[in-house]
């Protein structure tokens, strides 16, 4: 009987030890964001109840960035990496801290605001008075946006610039291949941010080249 009680006590002690060990293990999931917005360049999406406009200068032209559309294989919180020409891996413990389309729009808006410094830049969705003041809208359809740690990141996207009345002013396709500086997921995400910055620069260049009489035609 005493031996039986001793065995039970040992088992209970082991169970308690495993329980404490399990409680001590932290969640291994890591969360990432794309790029890092310059202070004051783009307003937080948390203020969705108010017009989310950002004044990048003293100009009167308003640029709207969005919507951004991502393919279904990327429309998830997990980061997706390329493992072959036709294969990908969905990472369980490496996730986006925000919806991917929101992160893409944020970085693009940041680049446009920085490179078209006399314009107002707003992020989709916009409402009320802000919606009525937009002269240029950038719509982006992402075709591919993935990479491999220690290798390259590929961003392939079609994008359009629309006038405030819906007329198409430009239609382009951009493919950006960005090298990943070293192994690991954080460097890969950083490379994804740089690829988006390159796309944002292309969009800003196109906007700056648009004839300013577009505003007068509104």
Residue ranges with predicted function:
Residues 2-12:
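Bacterial N-terminal signal peptides that target proteins for export
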Residues 59-129:
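N-terminal segment of the mature soluble domain
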Residues 62-69, 80-82, 137-141, 154-160, ...:
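Soluble periplasmic/extracytoplasmic beta-strand elements of cell-envelope proteins
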Residues 88-97, 165-205:
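Short secondary-structure boundary motifs at beta->alpha junctions and helix caps
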Residues 9, 39-58:
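Intrinsically disordered, low-complexity terminal tails and inter-domain linkers enriched
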Residues 24-48, 116, 182-218:
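C-terminal/domain-edge helix-coil "capping" segments
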Residues 19-22:
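C-terminal motif of bacterial Sec signal peptides marking the signal peptidase cleavage site
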Residues 25-48, 115-165:
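Surface-exposed short loop/turn segments
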């Amino acid at each position: 009987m005493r031996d039986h009680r001793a065995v039970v006590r040992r088992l209970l002690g082991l169970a308690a030890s495993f329980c404490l060990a399990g409680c001590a293990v932290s969640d291994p999931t890591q969360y990432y964001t794309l790029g890092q917005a310059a202070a004051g360049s783009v307003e937080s999406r948390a203020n969705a109840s108010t017009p989310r406009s950002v004044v990048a200068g003293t100009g009167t032209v308003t640029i709207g960035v969005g919507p951004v559309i991502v393919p279904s294989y990327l429309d998830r919180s997990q980061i997706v990496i390329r493992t072959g020409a036709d294969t990908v891996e969905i990472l369980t413990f490496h996730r986006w801290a925000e919806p991917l389309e929101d992160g893409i729009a944020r970085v693009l808006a940041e680049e446009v605001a920085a490179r078209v410094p006399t314009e107002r830049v707003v992020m989709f969705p916009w409402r009320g008075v802000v919606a009525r003041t937009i002269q240029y809208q950038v719509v982006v359809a992402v075709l591919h946006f993935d990479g491999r740690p220690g290798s390259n990141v590929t961003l392939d996207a079609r994008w359009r610039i629309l006038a405030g009345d819906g007329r198409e002013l430009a239609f382009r396709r951009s493919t950006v291949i960005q090298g990943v500086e070293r192994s690991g997921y954080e460097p890969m995400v950083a490379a994804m941010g740089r690829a988006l910055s390159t796309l944002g620069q292309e969009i800003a260049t196109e906007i700056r080249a648009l004839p300013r009489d577009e505003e007068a035609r509104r």
